[in-house]
Amino acid sequence: MTFELRAAFAPCGDQPEAIAKLTQGIRNDVQSQVLLGTTGSGKTFTIANVVANVNRPTLVLAHNKTLAAQLYQEFKEFFPNNAVEYFISYYDYYQPEAYIARNDTYIEKSLLINSEIDKLRLSATRSILERRDTLIVSSVSCIYGIGSPENYASMALELKVGKEYPRTLLAAQLVKMNYQASPVAQRSTFRERGSVIDIFPAYESDQAIRLEFFNDTLSSIEYSDPLTMIPTASVASTIIYPGSHYVTPEAVREQAICSIREELEERMLFFHDRPVEQDRLFHRTTHDIEMIKETGFCKGIENYSRHFTKMPPGAPPACLLDYFPEDFLLVIDESHQTLPQIRAMYRGDLSRKQSLVEYGFRLPSAYDNRPLTYEEAQKYFHNVIYVSATPGETELNESQGHIVEQIIRPTGIPDPIPEIRPATGQVDDLLEEIRKRLSKSQEKILVISITKKLAEDIAAFLSELDIAAAYLHSGIETAERTRILADLRLGNIDVLIGVNLLREGLDLPEVSLVAILDADKEGFLRSTSSLIQFCGRAARNVEGKVIFYADQKTRSIEQTLKETERRRQIQLDYNKANNITPKPIIKAIFANPIPQGGKKESQEPAKTPLSIKELEKLIKKFENLMQEAAHEFRFDEAAKYRDKMKAAKEQLLYLS
């Protein structure tokens, strides 16, 4: 299949030229290009057009889950008939294994896996192996090891009508693929009923596979509704993919066990004069080997990944990037933040594992269960488009002059010129500006502070004045961060104060004021790049305004003013030449995801959007009702609850 772009609008402004240049660059095998696009200029739409033009498997890399979720939703709308997939960390909670030598404290790995995201990850790898019209939106999880595509593909099970498959052997093979025999219809399971085997793929929630046999001959394959098992399609063949990225063929597993034992013997000699470490490593590793022999799996199996892939020590791990063909297109969104993040991943992982290996908790091969280094990741940059309003030196150097500007916004809204006010008395002045905007409906304010403490103090000060305010910084747990961002989008918060709000992807049309406190304190978050990015947060609103609270004009402020004026003039000239009046983006933040039906519901007043906690409760409620209805053979009713649960999960995924 080819990529089929669906949009209710055509490219305009700078977009047609940007699309043409980027497309031609890829066709001419230009390795690196930069799309320098202002906030609100439609960069995602431009990339979607390029993807449709070049028709290659595509990986879009975002620097956090929030941005990845936004991009995933947008690309799904642009390519409804293609495989748009989502690949991020599937941990709702993750405490990595660690050892603190100074106080002899071992911290065992603790985690909570999000089943829905696990399904999406498996769906992503299935799609990229099966079809070229695949676009995967990913966080930096794509550079972490997940098991080799060769092992994963070799464990896939191809079934054809008319061929013989002894059912006992088929069931055993499904177990090896990480499927469980269960009477309950849920993903990663299968069930046998007479001459029928129903399989519920690990990467699907809307489709089951029903196999019917005559003796051991496969007589039919039907795709079915997983609740009602009513057939939706009949096919001559199908492929069932494993329920985990870490499954391996038996021969590979046996070879890996031998290799692990050899490394263990070497390490026993290393610890000959350290009996505590020697005993600890021997018992831990021996237990893991026995688990792998018996079940094909053990806790922390990823630490032995090198033995399964037969790679030499220090070799890069197999990751999502290895699942793509060589001619894939890589799009790095917000590259000025994403590239530094890729650089940082390896160093953080290495420092944690050093003490685990040194004190006998892990074999040295655990070092190879890691993210790629930046240099290793670069080897996959065959055709890459860096996307940013403020690209860094790395991207500019790599692109060797292949820089495509996209300054003009389809909305006609020019960049707001930052107003500079004294830093002395900045909080009182800010309060007055906030009150002006809160007298208007639906307007939001972003405040950028210089420290976490100041963000907390301002939020407390505003809250005492009955202003709906909250602070956001790195000290807040992920779950709470998610809730705060959701409340901002849902309208429960009017003012958000933070130190680095750029990382949150807050491009809201409702933001009419961005205030940067202590803007003259030169540093990472007061650099030219950061200041321009902050200004862009107000460029989606016709009334958008930016205030720099500064007692002096720093070099970064001067460069920001110069670049902002340049971009503003380009937009104004375009508006004048094309008789365009700036207009705001009309976009609903969130709608109630639960389908409404029936006379009674239609007469109820419109419900306010649901919070994350409310959605989680609702999902659990619908899941229980669905299972209860299915157990009582009320399949039509169960299907309705299934659809409601799916809609709620999609909304929760977007909020998260």
Swiss-Prot record:
Oligomeric form and interacting partners: Forms a heterotetramer with UvrA during the search for lesions. Interacts with UvrC in an incision complex.
NCBIfam families: PRK05298.1, uvrb
Species name: Chlamydia caviae (strain ATCC VR-813 / DSM 19441 / 03DC25 / GPIC) (Chlamydophila caviae)
Listed InterPro entries: Helicase/UvrB_N, Helicase_ATP-bd, Helicase_C-like, P-loop_NTPase, UVR_dom, UVR_dom_sf, UvrB, UvrB_inter
PANTHER family for this protein: UVRABC SYSTEM PROTEIN B (PTHR24029:SF0)
Residue ranges constituting the Helicase C-terminal domain according to the UniProt record: 426-589
Molecular function in Gene Ontology: ATP binding; ATP hydrolysis activity; DNA binding; excinuclease ABC activity
Keywords of this entry: ATP-binding, Cytoplasm, DNA damage, DNA excision, DNA repair, Excision nuclease, Nucleotide-binding, SOS response
Domain remark text: The beta-hairpin motif is involved in DNA binding.
Primary role: The UvrABC repair system catalyzes the recognition and processing of DNA lesions. A damage recognition complex composed of 2 UvrA and 2 UvrB subunits scans DNA for abnormalities. Upon binding of the UvrA(2)B(2) complex to a putative damaged site, the DNA wraps around one UvrB monomer. DNA wrap is dependent on ATP binding by UvrB and probably causes local melting of the DNA helix, facilitating insertion of UvrB beta-hairpin between the DNA strands. Then UvrB probes one DNA strand for the presence of a lesion.
Any matching Pfam family: ResIII
Cellular localisation: Cytoplasm
Record bears the keyword Lipid biosynthesis: no
Annotated protein name in UniProt: UvrABC system protein B
Gene Ontology CC entries for this record: cytoplasm; excinuclease repair complex
